[in-house]
Amino acid sequence: MANHLLIGLGGTGGKVLREFRKKVYEEFRSNEPTNGTCINYLYVDSSEDDLNSREGWKVMGKYVHLKEAQKVSIHGLDMNKFQNLSLYPGIKCFLNSGDIDLMTSKLGPLVTAGIGGQRRRLGRTLFANNLASRDGSDFMSRLKQAVQAMQSQTNDQQVTFHICAGLAGGTGSGSVVDTIAQIRQEYRPQPGGTQYKVYLYLYVPEINVANASHDSGFYQANGYAALSELNAMSVGAYYPYDVTGTMDNVTGQVRRLCEGFEPFDAAFLYSNVDEAGKTLNLAKALPASVADFIFQKTVLSAGTGKMARLDGCENDGAG
């Protein structure tokens, strides 16, 4: 029995999880697939409204919203922490003096509100702040709980992680690198590469911004910066700090992660324009299309046809 953990980062990732849940219910009349596939979910967001909203989570007369244990709120950041950063090495390690000045003098309302606000550095800070809590509702605690639940249910240690995020905003774009790094630190690739796989499904900002109100000046720049970091990770040129603040015993500094192994197995990039040139609605049609693709990869049999060729390319490059 296959285990798959779908992780949604920010609003875009949350929409993909929503549409995936609806697809599962449409096919099986149940929140869980009944064909031997085990699916679990983790939705990470800085917006409490989005995390708790049930709007759009209804299909065929039934709500398919996530359980509380499948949500991670990275909302909220105490401004006083910037005055005592030495106590929070997981945050201090990646902030420079300019970042600190910007957050304390100009981004105060965003920081106090605890939202990404289309600022990648703020999104990363919120994610690191969440990891510092270790109160059972933080990302790593919820991640381990989700993985252990699947492994116990299926008696199978193999887990595939599917990370969904948009690269234009602050939360998804700012947290995707550290999400990958933390997963890989806890679930490292095993010999043969079959036990823990990590796939990325990333929305690349549209060339012509669909809604001008969505762009506060960093929309496309965020996408470029995130892709640059992910590319550097994939070729071994960039090893992210461990934002939990764990120190390296040799250097005495916050350790770096993902050295010596592949951070992820494949990254699927998509925009709001399909191969036929048709523009898809960002709120529903686009996340539904991505959810359909993931559904094909995870729930339906990939033994034949185009999906088998795709799996072949991912596993050994043979196609």
Question: Can you annotate each of these PLM segments?
Answer:
Residues 4-8, 12-22, 26-160, 167, ...:
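Terminal, contiguous helix-loop blocks that mediate binding/assembly
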